[in-house]
From Swiss-Prot:
Protein name in UniProt: GTP cyclohydrolase III
Gene of this entry: gch3
Similarity annotation: Belongs to the archaeal-type GTP cyclohydrolase family.
Cited Gene3D superfamilies: 3.30.70.270, Nucleotide cyclase
GO biological process entries: biosynthetic process
UniProt cross-references to PANTHER family, sorted A to Z: GTP CYCLOHYDROLASE III
């Protein structure tokens, strides 16, 4: 699988130049440029996992190196600082992002040609969480969401996957297609979490299919997982 690691260069120095009354401004600018990056990424059929904001990842199977270069140039035009990128390859998203992350410390940004793989996207949703907000505090609900995020992250890490919190009670994961059965086995009898699985040629398609799967689970309340494949 192919993962593009993206690092914002001199990001900390940029934030420090904004003065002491800067946290609101940092959040405003971060959200503004991440909105633009999401828009650009969608045009190239990928999806940014924003993670730390100053470092983020993209699953880029199904995208040519020429397209990646155009995408990176488009992103650079919309960021307040420079960027450094590196393309990593691995049998799993976890391995690919590790290789891409190590590569960021090297001086060369050259992209090698790698074989494209199908992408398995996972859209997780917590059962009854919205209803539970009637009986708990906003902060306690957030703590539960965070604890589940940690548990899901650890599970996916063990099978070579990566995870992003989407907001609300939703999470987005990626695994290799070889690990899909492990996900099904884990959540087939789980009455707390449902997972929509999508398999596609690129990240955007896989995510769309995962969300389609999740909607089908919601319409069929007896199931905890469903899979759609391109």
């Amino acid at each position: 699988m192919k993962v593009l690691a993206i690092k914002l260069v001199d990001y900390r120095e940029w934030t420090e130049r904004l003065g002491y009354d800067r946290e609101w401004l940092i959040q405003k600018i971060q959200n503004k440029f991440m909105m633009k990056i999401h828009e650009i990424a969608s045009q190239y059929s990928t999806f940014p996992l924003q993670l730390r904001f100053d470092n983020f990842l993209m699953i880029v199977d199904g995208i040519t190196n020429t397209q990646l270069i155009y995408m990176i140039n488009d992103m650079q035009e919309n960021l307040p600082v420079g960027i450094k990128t590196c393309l990593g390859y691995g049998k799993t998203p976890l391995e690919a992002q590790w290789n891409a992350s190590v590569c960021l410390n090297n001086k060369e940004d050259k992209f090698k040609e790698y074989v494209d793989e199908k992408i398995a996207a996972l859209h997780f949703d917590i059962n009854f969480n919205t209803e539970a907000l009637k009986y708990t505090s906003v902060y306690d609900s957030f703590l539960e969401i965070t604890n589940i995020y940690v548990d899901l992250s650890r599970f996916l890490y063990k099978i070579g996957g990566i995870l992003q919190y989407l907001g609300g009670d939703n999470y987005l994961g990626f695994v290799s297609t070889n690990s899909v059965n492990k996900v099904i086995e884990k959540f087939s009898d789980d009455n707390k979490i449902k997972v929509g699985i999508g398999i596609g040629q690129n990240a955007r398609t896989a995510i769309k299919l995962a969300t389609t799967s999740l909607e089908k689970i919601r319409n069929n309340r007896e199931k905890t997982w469903h899979i759609e494949e391109e």
